[in-house]
Amino acid sequence: MKMTKVLKPSEVQRDWVLIDAEGKTFGRILTEVATLLRGKHKPSFTPNVDCGDYVVIINAEKAKFTGVKLEDKEYFTHSGYFGSTKSKKLGDMLENHTEKLYKLAVRGMLPKTTLGRQMLKKLKVYAGAEHPHTAQINKEA
């Protein structure tokens, strides 16, 4: 009888994947990133173990957005106090807080648990083409 192999956290082998966002659609990039961070592309995927790869996104500010999302889409924050709702347009977030925008969007695609937060820490986003992880990168997507 064959048994399913369950991966232990000590047996996980992680790769560093580089994604160039220039000219690619924002949402398509993020679905690929969420899959890589979760580890679902690996045959040894185990849902209760963080078996995903490290992902480095470069040229994040050069991603494409379809339609009029840059002017219309808004992100809301609330501190919990009355009247403290703040909103920022997608275009402003892309200019000023590119890294935060990508992490916020990917966070919605990952599990809402401590495991999901652990996966999100493996995402590195850079607005330009320069990044400090050149030595670690061993794959390009």
Curated annotation (Swiss-Prot):
Q: Name one GO molecular function term.
A: structural constituent of ribosome
* This protein's UniProt keywords: Ribonucleoprotein, Ribosomal protein
Q: Name one GO biological process term.
A: negative regulation of translation
Pfam family of the protein (one): Ribosomal_L13
Stored InterPro entries: Ribosomal_uL13, Ribosomal_uL13_bac-type, Ribosomal_uL13_CS, Ribosomal_uL13_sf
Q: Which Gene3D superfamilies match?
A: Ribosomal protein L13 (3.90.1180.10)
Might you report a single GO cellular component term?
A: cytosolic large ribosomal subunit
The UniProt subunit note reads as follows: Part of the 50S ribosomal subunit.
Report the family membership.
Belongs to the universal ribosomal protein uL13 family.
Under the heading HAMAP family, the entry gives: Ribosomal_uL13
What is the documented function of this protein? Answer: This protein is one of the early assembly proteins of the 50S ribosomal subunit, although it is not seen to bind rRNA by itself. It is important during the early stages of 50S assembly.
Q: What is this protein called?
A: Large ribosomal subunit protein uL13
| Biological source species | Sulfurovum sp. (strain NBC37-1)
What does the organism's lineage look like at the top?
Bacteria, Pseudomonadati, Campylobacterota, Epsilonproteobacteria, Campylobacterales
Encoding gene, per UniProt annotation: rplM
